[in-house]
Amino acid sequence: MVKLKIRAVQPPPNDSRSSTPATGPPPPIPKIKIKTREPKGPRLTKIRLKRVREPGLGYDSEASDREEDTYIEEQIILRLPPGEDCEYVRKAIENREVGRGADIWVKFKDQRRAVVHVNGHLYAAKLVDLPCIIESNKSFDKKVIFKAADICQMLIATERIEHENSVLNTQLKQADYIYPHGLTTPMHWVRQKRFRKRVSNRTIEAVENEVDRLLAMDERAESTSNELIDQAQLARDSSIALSEDTSFDGMAGLRGTSIDRDDQSVQTDMFDGMDEDDLAGQIEQGMLELSQDTRESTAEPRAAGEESASEEEEEEEEEEEEENEADDETRENKRQNRLVREFISELESSIQKRRKDADEATNPILRNRFLADVNRMVTELELKRTQLVDNPE
């Protein structure tokens, strides 16, 4: 290190300089001293890294005071093999002892493999991707729940190990990190049963080429015409036409054949070649024709006597309808008033319950929400009471 030091005498003021004779001594010459000093030891260079913040990412405040970023909560599912250690973890969670003295910790060796320590035992674990997303909820009063996170990964503890580094001995493939099942029994092999496989690019290109070919043929055609045909209607029409042909042939055979009551063999031979459905349809059609002929033959003699009886019945029915209308209106009013009273009683009990929840709530947001519900239900209660007055018994 070089140190430079300059020492100079301050010149006198102007008045004294003018009073000094020209024959006086010359002004002094400044002296310069240079001192060199060797460094005591190597000096370390300090490098300070500052993260570049992207606008809009994280907690980006314009305040002058330094503020910490908000915490981002990330959750995974821990699955242990059944046994004493699994029950130990379950009881620790129920008693809220995790992180407060319970002998439980998790240490990740890499991005996918980890070590789970439970009650003095080590387990090898791997982090797998679930086939679906699971919502995690939390509650402060065991009444209202709030969504906390979306879970898409699970840490599976497989077997016990003696040392932490033993988990790195097993080589896993990329397919081992894709979990094929869900969390519940109905979601077993869900990736193969419910998720459709991705269509290859060759199939998509083949379909696009076929569409282009058909469009090119349409452009080269002199005239085109199209017609929309419903497949269900087409199948229905074909089945109706087939049944009509079968019934026509069957009825022609019935009319052209004489059946003797004493000779039952002729009847059995005729129906041997028919299906049960065709036979039932033919019998039903014959019965309909017979009943229609019978109604036509008996309707003519009764027509004259029924005209006078029908007029008397119509008059009696009109009188009964007028009486029933008055009774129906009274019954409807009573029924409506009963329903309104039941709704009012339920609404009053709900208002009391909400007011009690508002008094017991410690969170101001929940308390304001309960009070807003109370105000809404009070307004609805007043409206229902006016409806009860408008419909007296």
Swiss-Prot record:
Q: What InterPro entries does this protein map onto?
A: TAF7 (IPR037817), TAFII55_prot_cons_reg (IPR006751)
Q: Name one GO biological process term.
A: mRNA transport
Q: What does this protein do?
A: TAFs are components of the transcription factor IID (TFIID) complex that are essential for mediating regulation of RNA polymerase transcription. Also involved in the transport of mRNA from the nucleus to the cytoplasm.
Q: Where is this region: Disordered?
A: 1-43, 253-273, 290-340
How is this protein named in the record?
Transcription initiation factor TFIID subunit 7
Cellular compartment(s): Nucleus
Q: Which GO terms describe its cellular component?
A: cytosol; nucleus; transcription factor TFIID complex
List compositional bias (Basic and acidic residues) regions by residue number: 292-305, 331-340
Give residue spans, biased composition: Acidic residues. Answer: 308-330
Subunit note? TFIID is composed of TATA binding protein (TBP) and a number of TBP-associated factors (TAFs).
